[in-house]
Amino acid sequence: MRLQAVTAVAAWAVASACQSLPGTRTIWSRDADYKELSEKLSPSAKAYYPGSDEFEKANTRWSNLEVPTVNIVIVPGNENDVVETVKFANKKGLPFLAWNSAHGAMTTLGQMDSGIEIYLDQLSGVEIAEDGKTVTIAGGTKSKLVTDTLWAAGKQTVTGACECVGYIGPALGGGHGWLQGRHGTIGDQFESANIVLANGTLTSIDSSSDLWWAIKGAGHNFGIVTSVTSKTYDIEHKDWAIEILTFSGSKVVELYEAVNTHLLKNGTQPTDLINWSYWVNVPSADANNPVIQILIIQEGVNTVDSAYTTPFHSLSPITKEAHSGSYTDLAKWVGITTTDEPCQKTGAMNPRFPIYLETYNPQAQKKAFELFSDAIRGDSIFNGSLFAFDGYSTQGVRAIDEKSTAFAFRNQNVLTAPLISYMPDGPELDEKVAKLGNQLRQILHEGTGREHIPAYVNYANGDEGPEQWYGSESWRQSKLQSLKKKYDPNGMFSFYGPIA
């Protein structure tokens, strides 16, 4: 059962997509124009051209839908290499885009045409301060290295759940993670950051900078963060436990009523508790229809408290499984380690259509489940798709003034999105998927009774907009526009969640 569940999670979390370009497609001479840049780069910097294996590997993204067109990959060996590459791109009038693990799947990325990829893979490292209160993390560092390095030193911080995703990228959009109930979002941990601005200036910023507000929630729009210094914490609880329960889809209403009552508790879910759920095909559980999996995770115990699990046991799950271990086992239990399928490359399209919820509307859940099930059951080309509902604890997120950062959704309790995974087969299929994804999102939205759709920018499809990504309040939009005009007047950083 776990392996099948993990396969489903694979489609959700981080399936990869491969985009290679013809070897003849370049917009400047390798021998002439690139030489100008190469003379300014460090000896450890690298350049990959179309047609090479290195280029193909570096130019791989999570989703193959609307990918950037890259003509050369620069792999900086240090921060100054990023500076020189940005200056070179500006001089030549070339677009550029920095990426690390390349899990962002927003369709706006496809607007970068014939540009420079700044691949941060070599900028990787974790250095704990002598006093143990902070850690400096390089721009290309993956979450697993952060977690493992800190854990070995008796420390931890908030990171994303998936091991192969970068640490800094998610933080620029806020950043959800296992420990957010105690400490806030990933971005909330920042103490300072080194950032390369649109004009090629490398600067260090902290809370004294007006840009500090923006990079913690809308940071993709303002520069390339080459390193950050973040808060660390002593490990408070080494023990963790999980229980995974699989149900027939016919229980959808009862299940989400139970989640509301026994887990979410009107936004007062206990700090030590996390609840996720998936809608997914698991043939060994139901050969004909998608099922609902409820994942209940608890910190500081060897067995999840029966007060949380018993209400679900009474709903007659098809299967139950339990695991106990430490914080470093969480990714393994939910199937998102670096060796699991989510971190492998498949070439699939992987659009998501996120929406935050404060609570579940069980009837809306039923309506969405029926539509999703009809789309993915059996031999459907979408049968590897997944609908995920992430209910992290939120006390640490709510404890921080909602006006203090560009992350606008501190009062939301559930992060949800359907991931519709499929292999490329032309624009008509892409349009069909976009229609389905937005129908599913609209059902949940109508169930909330709200006017605006709050959408997590790190999961965004790209057809939303600044008000959905960064908050509908006029003061937020005005502040972002003002900072954009000041720091990036020419819109060089406008390919991911653009403000304008």
From Swiss-Prot:
Residues 65-235 form the FAD-binding PCMH-type domain. Its EC number is 1.-.-.-. Residues 1-20 form the signal peptide. Transmembrane segments: none annotated. Pathway: Pigment biosynthesis. PROSITE patterns: FAD_PCMH. InterPro entries: BBE, FAD-bd_PCMH, FAD-bd_PCMH-like_sf, FAD-bd_PCMH_sub2, FAD-linked_Oxidoreductase, Oxid_FAD_bind_N. Disruption phenotype: Impairs the production of N-pyruvoylanthranilamide ans downstream compounds. It comes from the Eukaryota. Glycans are attached at N199, N266, N275, N383. Keywords: FAD, Flavoprotein, Glycoprotein, Oxidoreductase, Signal. Pfam families: BBE, FAD_binding_4. GO terms for molecular function: FAD binding; oxidoreductase activity. FAD-linked oxidoreductase; part of the gene cluster that mediates the biosynthesis of the yellow pigment chrysogine. the NRPS chyA mediates the condensation of anthranilic acid and alanine into the intermediate 2-(2-aminopropanamido)benzoic acid. The remainder of the pathway is highly branched yielding at least 13 chrysogine-related compounds. This is FAD-linked oxidoreductase chyH. It comes from Penicillium rubens (strain ATCC 28089 / DSM 1075 / NRRL 1951 / Wisconsin 54-1255) (Penicillium chrysogenum). The gene is chyH.
